[in-house]
């Protein structure tokens, strides 16, 4: 269960980071806020068609660090990491699930569906049924219908 303070902090940082990142032609993929022993670790993942460069990361880190400092977020000392999402890109927003239909994904749920909490399979569809968003996953030649609101974590799976 995510602490409500951490959830709000993540949302606040997302709201500040998204326009900064978009102004450089990039897309915000994920914000992680982790409380370490004496400081916060804030991780920003961003992407764009064609990939992210080291210069992109450096520029966004400088700009976003200034913005976070002005808004006193997080409220204690922090380390800011800015990077591309990598090969195991997190799937966070609805458009991520639409974009990566047909790809292999790893999904962890807050409660079991059909007796399973962790899924690894092909994302076949992302649909809405009776006002609820559903992922259709093929795993071991069987189809599973997973409610979006049960997902704790979802990532692409890269095969070498």
From Swiss-Prot:
One Gene Ontology cellular component: cytosol
Keyword Zinc among UniProt keywords: no
Purpose: Required for maturation of 30S ribosomal subunits.
SUPFAM superfamilies: YhbC-like, C-terminal domain (SSF74942), YhbC-like, N-terminal domain (SSF75420)
The keyword Cell inner membrane is annotated on this UniProt entry: no
Name of this protein: Ribosome maturation factor RimP
Compartment(s): Cytoplasm
Keywords: Cytoplasm, Ribosome biogenesis
Biological processes, Gene Ontology terms: ribosomal small subunit assembly; translation
Similarity comment: family membership: Belongs to the RimP family.
């Amino acid at each position: 269960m995510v602490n409500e303070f951490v959830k709000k902090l993540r949302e606040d940082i997302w709201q500040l980071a998204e326009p900064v990142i978009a102004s450089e032609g990039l897309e915000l993929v994920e914000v992680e806020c982790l409380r370490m022993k004496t400081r916060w670790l804030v991780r920003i993942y961003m992407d764009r068609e064609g990939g992210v460069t080291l210069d992109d990361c450096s520029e966004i880190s400088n700009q976003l660090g200034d913005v976070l400092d002005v808004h006193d977020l997080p409220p204690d000392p922090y380390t800011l990491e800015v990077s591309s999402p990598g090969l195991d890109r997190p799937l966070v927003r609805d458009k991520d699930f639409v974009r990566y239909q047909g790809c292999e994904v790893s999904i962890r749920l807050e409660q079991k569906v059909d007796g399973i909490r962790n899924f690894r399979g092909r994302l076949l569809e992302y649909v809405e049924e009776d006002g609820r968003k559903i992922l259709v996953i093929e795993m071991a030649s069987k189809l599973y219908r997973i409610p979006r609101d049960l997902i704790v974590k979802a990532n692409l799976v890269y095969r070498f």
